[in-house]
């Protein structure tokens, strides 16, 4: 019998927070190339797991409006849980039919220190 299950859709692993703005509308703002690299969508729910601090939170993705590449800007209340330089995992999930789970392949990108993809 088939049913829906939640699976890892995509993640950026070992990325680095570049900014944390407490006095800002909540979310995590990513530079456009990171949104594309992670196969994320605007306003998509994202889990932010802070490797440095050992904390986890859930927020949503928005596009960073500056010119800097490799930007991960944690905003609002979430900025109390992430500091510039912290290593993080950004993960999104999807609902799929359980019969497809064994063949599911999440999109996983391991990051360099400068928030580019490791080769």
Annotated model-derived regions:
Residues 7, 16-18, 22-99, 114:
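Compact, glycine-rich, soluble single-domain proteins
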């Amino acid at each position: 019998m088939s049913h829906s299950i939640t699976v890892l859709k995509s993640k950026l692993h070992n990325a680095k927070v570049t900014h944390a703005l407490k006095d800002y509308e909540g979310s995590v703002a990513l530079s456009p190339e990171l949104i594309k690299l992670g196969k994320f969508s605007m306003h998509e729910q994202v889990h932010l797991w802070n490797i440095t601090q050992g904390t986890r939170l859930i927020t949503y993705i928005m596009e960073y409006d500056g010119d800097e590449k490799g930007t991960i800007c944690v905003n609002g209340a979430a900025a109390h849980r992430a500091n510039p330089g912290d290593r993080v995992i950004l993960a999104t999930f999807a609902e799929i039919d359980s019969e497809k789970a064994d063949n599911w392949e999440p999109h996983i990108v391991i990051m360099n220190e400068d928030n580019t993809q490791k080769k």
